[in-house]
Amino acid sequence: TKSSRYCTTEGXDTALRHXPIGANQSAFKSKRXASESLASELIAASNRDAKCFSINRKDGKERVAKAAR
């Protein structure tokens, strides 16, 4: 069995897919450069921070899938 510390492959794919979207949204109409936004998004995702767009979306999809079971 896998430790709860590690996410599933599907969850990791979802988080990776949403990381650039979250970085783009945080950089849009702000003084932050896109590279800074992407770096902060990746750091937040590695820390599993709930404020991170990609982690938030992944957790939301997992919550909906669990409720549908």
UniProtKB/Swiss-Prot annotation:
Supply one GO CC term from the record.
ribosome
Any Pfam family hit:
Ribosomal_S7
InterPro entries, sorted: Ribosomal_uS7_dom, Ribosomal_uS7_dom_sf
Q: Which UniProt keywords apply?
A: Ribonucleoprotein, Ribosomal protein, RNA-binding, rRNA-binding
Q: Name one GO molecular function term.
A: rRNA binding
Question: So which domain of life are we looking at?
Answer: Archaea
Recorded hits in SUPFAM superfamilies, A to Z, give: Ribosomal protein S7
Give the family, as the similarity comment puts it.
Belongs to the universal ribosomal protein uS7 family.
Subunit structure and binding partners: Part of the 30S ribosomal subunit.
| Function summary | One of the primary rRNA binding proteins, it binds directly to 16S rRNA where it nucleates assembly of the head domain of the 30S subunit. Is located at the subunit interface close to the decoding center.
This chain's protein is named Small ribosomal subunit protein uS7
Lineage, highest ranks first = Archaea, Methanobacteriati, Methanobacteriota, Stenosarchaea group, Methanomicrobia
